[in-house]
């Protein structure tokens, strides 16, 4: 998993 993908995924989960 790339850093960008992890950041986006983490942000999406946190935002939801």
UniProtKB/Swiss-Prot annotation:
Induction: In stationary phase and in minimal glucose or glycerol medium (at protein level).
Keyword vocabulary terms for this entry: Stress response
Superkingdom of origin organism: Bacteria
UniProt-recorded name of the protein: Uncharacterized protein IlvX
Organism encoding this protein: Escherichia coli (strain K12)
Organism phylogeny: Bacteria, Pseudomonadati, Pseudomonadota, Gammaproteobacteria, Enterobacterales
